[in-house]
Swiss-Prot record:
Pathway: Carbohydrate metabolism; tricarboxylic acid cycle; succinate from succinyl-CoA (ligase route): step 1/1
Every ATP-grasp domain range: 9-244
Family matches, as Pfam families: ATP-grasp_2, Ligase_CoA
Chemical reaction(s) catalysed: succinate + ATP + CoA = succinyl-CoA + ADP + phosphate; GTP + succinate + CoA = succinyl-CoA + GDP + phosphate
Cofactor info, note text: Binds 1 Mg(2+) ion per subunit.
Top-level taxon: Bacteria
Enzyme class per UniProt: ligase
Family: Belongs to the succinate/malate CoA ligase beta subunit family.
Gene that specifies this protein: sucC
Lineage: Bacteria, Bacillati, Bacillota, Bacilli, Bacillales
A Gene Ontology BP annotation from the UniProt entry: tricarboxylic acid cycle
Organism name: Staphylococcus saprophyticus subsp. saprophyticus (strain ATCC 15305 / DSM 20229 / NCIMB 8711 / NCTC 7292 / S-41)
Protein name: Succinate--CoA ligase [ADP-forming] subunit beta
Length: 388
């Protein structure tokens, strides 16, 4: 689950992570009133959307007067902001964060992530703040420093100080930076985050260490422990199809292609998308029906896939382990009839009760193209979509 910058900063502030003062506003008039509450001569007007790259896209403005705050607020509210993370459709700006300006001396990047290779939380930092960390990793990887954290000990003060030294935090601010990083680590652990990222972290002319940004994602599997965080969810920022999928315990992520995919298991889903790409197709989605799919679940999965008007064909790739192939086949037949599917459909089944599953598909009399392997299925759906 993602949250807005202003929500992330509120969490930071409550747990001892230093951030500038700021207020959220929903209208231009409210933006001016909120700016008046801040003891500042310079204001930062920030678009609040669930995407990075806002600054480069024109979603962050520096205002030197209340009249400029109003001008920028009117300019941004209601605008569709397109960044490298939103896709070409962009996201509508429905709220702003009005923040006090500060005397920035230097910008840095810091982030806590889960390193799958070490099964540990890892602190990453760089003195190349203000730019995308992926860009830094590609061009100057030597400027990224990492600390792997022992889950029993937590982020040790010496590790925090070492990172601060490595990214050239001024000597007089080293201890503040180390304390800042330890507090940020506590946010990551106590709130069950999957990522906490600040870009930029800054040092000021007064020697302060502040978070000028806040990207916080939470582990969905741990949200049941955090009712307060669940309340921060902004459904307007999420894909309606993803919201609908979550109601049926389906994992759905929309992509830019035209071949709908329905698979069980995240690994098989990714392999399926890779195979479609390999044969010249473009997946329209990632959709994992999980290990306990029912007829109802399969039907809803079809409806969600077909909710994307770009979809021109569907590839169902199921390995029946716990989930039996005959049950899946019955679900596919029922779903095709209910949604009155007219698009090309290729189905590859393998595993428990696979022969019975294939018989059910064949006996249905529906236009379902069978495939014996994932590669064959991918080739067939790519060909059918191109011929359609």
């Amino acid at each position: 689950m993602n949250i807005h910058e202003y929500q992330g900063k509120a969490i930071f502030r409550s747990m001892g992570v230093a951030v500038p003062e700021g207020r959220v506003a929903y209208t231009a008039e409210e933006a001016v009133e909120k700016a008046k509450e801040l003891d500042s001569k310079v204001y930062v007007v920030k678009a609040q959307i669930h995407a990075g790259g806002r600054g480069k896209a024109g979603g962050v403005k520096i205002a030197k007067s209340l009249s400029e705050v109003e001008t920028y607020a009117k300019e941004l509210l209601g605008k569709t902001l397109v960044t490298h993370q939103t896709g070409p459709e962009g996201k509508e700006i429905k709220r702003l964060y009005i923040e006090e300006g500060c005397d920035i001396q230097k910008e840095y990047y810091v982030g806590f992530v889960i390193d799958r290779a070490t099964d540990r939380v890892t602190l990453m930092a760089s003195e190349e703040g203000g730019t995308e960390i992926e860009e830094v990793a590609a061009k100057t990887p030597e400027k990224i420093f990492k600390e792997t954290i022992d889950p029993v000990v937590g982020l040790a003060p010496y590790q925090a100080r070492r990172i601060a030294f490595n990214i050239n935090i001024p000597k007089e601010s080293i201890n503040k930076a180390a304390k800042f990083l330890v507090s940020l680590y506590n946010v990551f652990i106590e709130k069950d985050c999957s990522i906490v990222e600040i870009n930029p972290l800054v040092t000021t002319g007064e020697g302060e260490v502040l978070a000028l940004d806040a990207k916080v994602n939470f582990d969905d599997n741990a949200l049941f422990k955090h009712k307060d965080i669940q309340e921060l969810r902004d459904l307007e920022e999420e894909d309606p199809k993803e919201i609908e999928a979550s109601k049926y315990d389906l994992s759905y992520i929309a992509l830019d292609g035209d071949i709908g995919c329905m698979v069980n298991g995240a690994g098989l889903a990714m392999a399926t998308m890779d195979t479609i790409n390999h044969f010249g197709g473009n997946p329209a989605n990632f959709l994992d029906v999980g290990g306990g799919a029912t007829k109802e679940k399969v039907t809803e999965a079809f409806k969600i896939i077909l909710g994307d008007e770009n979809v021109k064909g569907i590839f169902v790739n199921i390995f029946g382990g716990i989930m039996k192939c005959d049950i899946i086949a019955e679900g596919i037949v029922a779903a095709v009839k209910e949604v009155e599917l007219t698009l090309p459909l290729v189905v590859r089944l393998e595993g428990t009760n696979v022969e019975r599953g294939k018989e059910i598909l064949k006996e249905s009399g529906l236009a379902i193209e069978p495939a014996a392997t994932m590669a064959e299925g991918a080739q067939k759906i790519v060909k059918l979509v191109k011929e359609a």
